[in-house]
Amino acid sequence: MRCYYVLIAIAAVLSGIATAAADSRHNKLAAVDSDKTTDRVELFLRRNDELDAENTDERIVAGAIPLNARIIKRLVKLEKKMVDPKLADDLLEGTTLKTELDAALPYAGRTQVFERWHAQGLDPSSITKAVNIHPAIEKKYRIVYMMYELFVKSADKKRLAKLKRKRTND
């Protein structure tokens, strides 16, 4: 029974297609209105302003911006001097902050220094503020304040876990 319905539906579709093709209205081509099509194309362009002739004329008249390589090299050298680790050593020479930060730099002594700081109640933001005094100091000791912040977070999580275990055991 279902097969008959399928055959009837296919025959109806095919007869509709055949009559549509035979109809003379469908064989005529419509004229293209050029003004409307350009408006439609401009709607879909992402950057109409770049294709505008007036803007390109202004860019051509202005010309390329000349780059002064000597000034650029001088600025790059100045920037490298600003973040030089030797400058950080010179700035912190003879301070207790330098000895503490130098002790926290190697991986082996880092946890002992962090535990001492945490026991003293040092906040990670205070270490961050002390290190961010100068770009050279920040570059050299960035790992210290980042690792100390992570150390404090993990120590706080461990402390909370112990408190929760203690509550559940009581």
From Swiss-Prot:
Signal sequence annotation: 1-22
Gene Ontology cellular component list: extracellular region; host cell nucleus
Cell wall biogenesis/degradation recorded as keyword: no
Intervals of motif RxLR-dEER: 43-59
Motif (Nuclear localization signal): 157-167
Compartment list: Secreted; Host nucleus
Induction note: Expression is induced early during infection of P.infestans.
Keywords attached to this entry: Host nucleus, Secreted, Signal
Main location: secreted
Function of the molecule: Effector that enhances P.infestans colonization of Nicotiana benthamiana leaves, which suggests that PITG_22798 contributes to P.infestans infection. Triggers cell death in Nicotiana benthamiana. PITG_22798-triggered cell death is dependent on SGT1-mediated signaling but not HSP90, and is suppressed by the P.infestans avirulence effector 3b (AVR3b).
Family stated for the protein in its record: Belongs to the RxLR effector family.
Domain notes: The nuclear localization signal is required for the localization into the host nucleus and the ability to induce host cell death.
Name of protein: RxLR effector protein PITG_22798
